[in-house]
Amino acid sequence: MRNWRQAENIRLYIAVGCGAAIGALLRFLSGWVIVAILGANPLWGTSFVNIVGSFIIMFFATLTGPEGRWLVSPAWRQFVMGGLCGGLTTFSSMSLDTFLLVLHGNAAFALAYLCGLVFLSLSAAMLGLIAAQRINR
């Protein structure tokens, strides 16, 4: 019994690690596209991945939860929610961006950025919930 649990834990660790690697790569590529190709401010890259990640995690959590239509293993849930979304989203970059704005004399914009990003991320999560609930019907 103990060996089975250890094997299951190893599967979860691998799932989270693989998902996190993919999520981090997607975050990097998203930021690169937004800054290098579109010429936008790096704040848009941080905002984009946090908003998209909020939608994905709620959408997937609702579809694969107890009343969800999709039956997936715990490893798949961890791959998507803990790994992919965890690697994609970035609270630390949002914090850094906010403090850099304050340090450069843009405190009002920093507050607007922070409040706006939290609002939009929560709104995206709500849209993910609504979309998944419609599929679950």
Swiss-Prot record:
Q: Give the transmembrane ranges.
A: 20-40, 43-63, 83-103, 110-130
Q: Which domain of life is it from?
A: Bacteria
Q: Which UniProt keywords apply?
A: Cell inner membrane, Cell membrane, Ion channel, Ion transport, Membrane, Metal-binding, Sodium, Transmembrane, Transmembrane helix, Transport
| Topological category with respect to the lipid bilayer | Multi-pass membrane protein
Tell me yes or no: is Lyase among this UniProt entry's keywords. Answer: no
Entry-linked HAMAP family = FluC
Q: Per the record's keyword annotation, is Nucleotide-binding included, yes or no?
A: no
Q: Which reaction does it catalyse?
A: fluoride(in) = fluoride(out)
What is any one of the record's Gene Ontology cellular component terms? plasma membrane
Against InterPro entries, the record matches this protein to: FluC (IPR003691)
What organism, scientifically named, is this protein from?
Answer: Brucella abortus biovar 1 (strain 9-941)
Question: What protein name is recorded for this chain?
Answer: Fluoride-specific ion channel FluC 3
Query: What does the entry give for GO biological process?
Result: cellular detoxification of fluoride
Any idea where this protein resides? Answer: Cell inner membrane
Any Pfam family matching the protein = CRCB
Specify which residues bind Na(+) according to the UniProt entry for this protein. G86, T89
Q: What's this protein's family per the entry?
A: Belongs to the fluoride channel Fluc/FEX (TC 1.A.43) family.
